[in-house]
Amino acid sequence: MRVLFASLASVGHTYPLIPLAVAVREAGHEVHFAAGENVHASLHRNGLRPFRPADSFYEIYAEDLEPDLARLRPDLIVHEWGQSGPAIAAQRAGIPSLWHGFGRMFPDGIGLEKPTLDRPHLDTCPPSLQDKDFLATAERIELRPVAYSEPLPEWRVERTSRPLVYLTLGTAFGTAEVLTTAIQGLTAAGIDVVVAAGNVRLGAVPKDVTVHEWVPQAELLPYVDAVVHHGGSGTTLGALAVGVPQLVLPQGADQFANADALSVAGAALSILPGELSADSVAESVRKLLSPRGGHRDAARAIAEEIARMPSPGEVARDLPRWAENR
């Protein structure tokens, strides 16, 4: 079977698809991946045959992909739900296709077109956090979210007797002001901090803070006591999968909805932009780490739920039947 994956050309939209794409390749199928060149290096490293449709840079339009569909003649197309172009191209060509999610559906303010519900959806969100209307109306294929990150040479986590917290604002929402405020609050609470600052330059930081441009998030998460982040779906699901409580500092897109869902579930606390200060961060992280708050227990319960979801390997073995639905 020949399977074509497609995503927007960003880490947050491409990385969630890589575990399933790799599992499909390891199951003996031929895999190709349509995306802009920004993410080709990671796709090449995983043997996923990336290519850039036409002149597409970030988003892929149906007209960009149609010549490649004629060339490759895939049996199945799997595309993230932020990409409507591949869905349209697949429909025109009569090729079965599946939506691949990356979190809760359908978040307000994310700026993406909602997919139609007439085709199956690979759902990586644990049911307890998923939108109840979506659960009731969509044809879902449960898929365990598996964190993917690029390995870094000589990476290691050093623990002390103090709590360790991972701080990130993702690839698109980082600002020096928010990161600095969070660092001030975390260090005031007596916490060691690992920061993934992206392209933000922070200058001098306290001795108990380690700043990196990027970290191998999937390798780091099992070792931390809490995650302080923007509420992006990748970090949210990655932390939940290992049972780590979260402090969410939402900045935009789907992050406010994620913060609300996590707070209701008891696995997180959140601080809105207008309420963010070093004091509010320190107070919140103390509550988060306190056994009396129950946040770790709630996060671990969701981790157990995620562990029961079908793995990428299990889902990959079942994909051929969806290709037969022509």
Question: Predicted segments — roles?
Answer:
Residues M1-R104, E177, T181, T187-R326:
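Glycosyltransferase specificity loop/lid
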